[in-house]
Amino acid sequence: MSAPDRPIEPDNRREARRWMAIVEEDLDVAGAATRLSRFGASAYHVQQAAEKLMKALLVLAGEPFRHSHDLDDLASRISLVYPRFSPRADALRHVSV
């Protein structure tokens, strides 16, 4: 049974929501930085949002991950756990700053 087919544990759901709240905050900061023409800061926060989004998906599936900022590694893990997300995860590999 693949991770998405398993029941989602309530603790995993709560932790994934916590990660997603941080994703939203990073995207808000990226938008504000873009409006101020601070494109480096914007790119950094978009990368952070992509990283945390992938970690939220792994947490939701109950999949452990090591403390890393490696989007390529996280995308590979997402592709294994959620094969249907593979094209989207692959696109996030290129967001590294």
Predicted feature locations:
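Terminal alpha-helical segments
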Residues: 1-97
